[in-house]
Amino acid sequence: MIEIIPAIDIIDGKCVRLSQGDYDSKKVYNENPVEVAKEFEANGVRRLHVVDLDGAASHHVVNHRVLEQIATRTSLIVDFGGGVKSDEDLKIAFESGAQMVTGGSVAVKDPELFCHWLEVYGSEKIILGADVKEHKIAVNGWKDESACELFPFLEDYINKGIQKVICTDISCDGMLKGPSIDLYKEMLEKFPNLYLMASGGVSNVDDIIALNEAGVPGVIFGKALYEGHITLKDLRIFL
């Protein structure tokens, strides 16, 4: 069964969502992300994806206090991403209670450092973030496109020991128009042992069912929950 991973995106300490990574499209859903996390936990959710959008924009971890509060006031397994660009950022994330940390831009810009993290912390704790626009990897909070093609990028890191990947199709993210199932199928055909977490575009329970039927191991979503297109009760069949 597919793993359900709600997302909490944070700006100014608040729970927000963007559309296609556009910071100008910010919508605040809750002033208190800890309350959101506690509600998820009360409904059987075990895993949480926390994104520091301030961190992604400013190239260093910013909202670690929110992470710390979520980690201490719930028993959710938290993976954290956004602005993790240095050893110090990684240390802050783990010390603040993240069980796993996602690196995206750093894996493109400083592969030596990212591989060092993989060696030190292992593939259980380090997740590769592959944010994709037309099969190219995007960096810096999705503001810039790199020259990295998705499949060679993945193959390189899988050969170096990566096992967990969060793949976000930027064109779908926050648009509630359905996920890129064909892309994820293609990824799993090429890399059948990959623990792939699909992110972006989930609009209803049928999308999650379709991802599950496609063999996708995990799904990350937020806006569909916050907008009421999916209820926590709907998710019980997966939990």
UniProtKB/Swiss-Prot annotation:
Keywords: Amino-acid biosynthesis, Cytoplasm, Histidine biosynthesis, Isomerase. Its EC number is 5.3.1.16. The keyword Membrane does not apply. Its main location: cytoplasm. The active site is at residues 9, 131. It holds the Pfam family His_biosynth. It catalyses: 1-(5-phospho-beta-D-ribosyl)-5-[(5-phospho-beta-D-ribosylamino)methylideneamino]imidazole-4-carboxamide = 5-[(5-phospho-1-deoxy-D-ribulos-1-ylimino)methylamino]-1-(5-phospho-beta-D-ribosyl)imidazole-4-carboxamide. The keyword Membrane does not apply. It is found in: Cytoplasm. Pathway: Amino-acid biosynthesis; L-histidine biosynthesis; L-histidine from 5-phospho-alpha-D-ribose 1-diphosphate: step 4/9. One of its GO terms (molecular function) is 1-(5-phosphoribosyl)-5-[(5-phosphoribosylamino)methylideneamino]imidazole-4-carboxamide isomerase activity. One of its GO terms (cellular component) is cytoplasm. Transmembrane segments: none annotated. GO terms for biological process: L-histidine biosynthetic process. Belongs to the HisA/HisF family. NCBIfam families: 1-(5-phosphoribosyl)-5-[(5-phosphoribosylamino)methylideneamino]imidazole-4-carboxamide isomerase (TIGR00007). HAMAP family: HisA (MF_01014). This is 1-(5-phosphoribosyl)-5-[(5-phosphoribosylamino)methylideneamino] imidazole-4-carboxamide isomerase. It comes from Bacteroides thetaiotaomicron (strain ATCC 29148 / DSM 2079 / JCM 5827 / CCUG 10774 / NCTC 10582 / VPI-5482 / E50). The gene is hisA.
